[in-house]
Structure formats: structure tokens, C-alpha cells
């Protein structure tokens, strides 16, 4: 309360749990989750978010899943109307392809951010965007930079996860890939000592070095994690260290 200007609020539209409209995406907890990027759905998603959060504007709204079933022009028109109405300030794309960024821009859009998976272990999809993001002055916001925790420490890599835990199904649980990660941690350890940082902070700093308008989307549950993460903002990796990593 009374601190709205101290925060940047970002949420998403297009995937809805209303059991109606759009294309079937998945089912969970008795709900049918549909992907709908039509103007009426985008408007409802945003207005529902405003009501639930108790605010009169959102700083950033991300189209959660770009959908080719509905006209890009309709989606862009809805988002631009919401900007004019003052309900959102900016908007972006997620789960997309570089061609989608071009399509939104060519339809008269002003895409401020692209949110995609990107890490030192999985950099390829993200790198496809960088030239276009520079062209359109777009922020690249990465999630997954710590690979579900597997890049935080060698000890984390040895943990066992229940079959219902998403971390049990990612590639880095494979024994052969674990061995590769162990070698990476050995290479990175002297760099952590030199830069006085954790493994997590080092790979976050690496991500920031890849594009000059990079934003990190990092999950945190402890104050200590927040304190550790913000250190990456002050680290300037040398070119030879980036190459080494």
C-alpha cells in the first residue's frame, strides 16, 4: 500500500484458466488452460490482473505464448489500446520466435521486452534474438539462467529429486552431463575467487555480458539469495574470462 511507485509490476496475458476461448494448451487441477491472443481475451486478462493486484496500471504485460491462430494485428491493437488507456505501460513476448518479434513490430507494435530461456548451458535460442532486439531497442529478459539451480554449486548437482519434481527431468541429471558440469565448476572456481562471488553470481554476470539490454528473471526465496544476486550487477567480466567460461 502507498508504495506502488517503488515497484515494477510485470504479469502475463494469453494463457487463461477460464475454461473458455482460444486453443487448448493443457489441463491442470480441473482447469482447461487455453491460449487466446484475441483482443477481448487480452483485455480481460489485463483487467482481471489489475483487479486482483489492486492497482490501476501494470508496468509490463507479456504475451505468455505467441499464438499463430489469431491475427497479430488484433493482438497488437489490443495492447496498444491498453497503453493508451493507461492500464499498461509496456508489453512484450514470451515463448516466441525471432520472426514473431518482427511480426509484432511490423504490425505497428512497440515490443519493449522479449522473455525467453537463456543460460550459459543453453544459449542458442536466446542468441537468435540479439540482433533483432538491437534493431528494435528491445530488452532481452532471460529466465532459466541458473538452470533450475544446477548452476548454483557442485553440491546442488548431487541432490536427488522426486519424480514429480521438474528438476528430476532436466538434462543435467544425466550422469554424463553431470561430469561435464563438474569440469565447468572446476574451471569457474578460480574466477569466483578472483571476482569474490558465488558460482550463481558468476553465471549471472556472464549472462549480463552477452547483450547490453539484458534483464535477469531470477526466482528467490531468501533474503540472502537477493543479496547474492544483486552482486552480479557490479561484476564486469574480462573478455578472456568470458571466453574461458
Feature annotation, model-predicted:
Residues 1-12:
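N-terminal binding-site loop/beta-alpha segment at the start of enzyme catalytic domains
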Residues 4-5, 55-56, 88:
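Active-site acidic short loop of glycosyltransferases
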Residues 12-14, 145-146:
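Active-site-proximal beta-strand/loop segments in catalytic clefts of secreted hydrolases
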Residues 14-18, 68:
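A short acidic, glycine/proline-enriched capping/turn motif at secondary-structure boundaries
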Residues 18-35:
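Surface-exposed, active-site-proximal loop segments in enzymatic domains
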Residues 35-53, 97-103:
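Short, acidic/polar
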Residues 50-71:
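Active-site groove signature of glycoside hydrolases
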Residues 66-244:
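Beta/alpha (TIM)-barrel catalytic core signal, keyed to glycine-rich beta->alpha loops juxtaposed to Asp/Glu
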Amino acid at each position: 500500500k502507498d508504495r506502488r511507485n517503488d515497484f515494477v509490476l510485470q504479469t502475463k496475458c494469453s494463457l487463461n484458466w477460464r475454461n473458455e476461448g482460444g486453443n487448448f494448451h493443457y489441463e491442470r487441477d480441473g482447469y482447461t488452460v487455453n491460449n487466446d491472443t484475441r483482443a477481448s481475451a487480452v483485455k480481460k486478462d489485463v483487467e482481471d490482473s489489475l483487479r486482483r493486484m489492486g492497482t490501476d496500471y501494470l508496468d509490463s504485460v507479456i504475451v505468455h505464448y505467441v499464438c499463430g491462430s489469431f491475427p497479430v494485428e488484433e493482438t497488437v491493437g489490443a495492447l496498444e489500446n491498453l497503453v493508451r488507456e493507461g492500464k499498461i505501460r509496456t508489453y512484450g513476448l514470451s515463448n516466441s520466435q525471432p520472426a514473431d518479434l518482427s511480426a509484432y513490430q511490423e504490425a505497428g507494435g512497440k515490443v519493449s521486452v522479449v522473455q525467453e530461456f537463456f543460460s550459459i548451458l543453453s544459449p542458442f535460442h536466446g542468441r537468435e534474438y540479439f540482433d533483432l532486439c538491437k534493431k528494435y531497442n528491445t530488452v532481452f529478459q532471460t529466465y532459466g539462467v541458473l538452470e533450475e539451480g544446477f548452476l548454483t554449486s557442485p553440491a546442488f548437482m548431487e541432490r536427488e529429486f522426486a519424480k514429480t519434481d521438474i528438476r528430476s527431468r532436466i538434462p543435467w541429471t544425466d550422469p554424463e552431463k553431470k561430469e561435464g558440469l563438474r569440469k565447468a565448476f572446476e574451471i569457474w572456481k578460480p574466477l569466483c575467487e578472483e571476482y569474490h562471488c558465488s558460482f550463481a553470481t558468476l553465471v549471472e554476470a556472464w549472462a549480463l555480458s552477452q547483450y547490453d539490454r539484458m534483464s535477469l528473471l531470477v526466482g528467490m526465496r531468501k533474503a540472502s539469495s537477493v543479496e547474492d544476486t544483486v552482486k552480479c550487477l557490479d561484476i564486469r567480466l574480462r573478455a578472456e574470462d568470458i571466453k574461458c567460461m
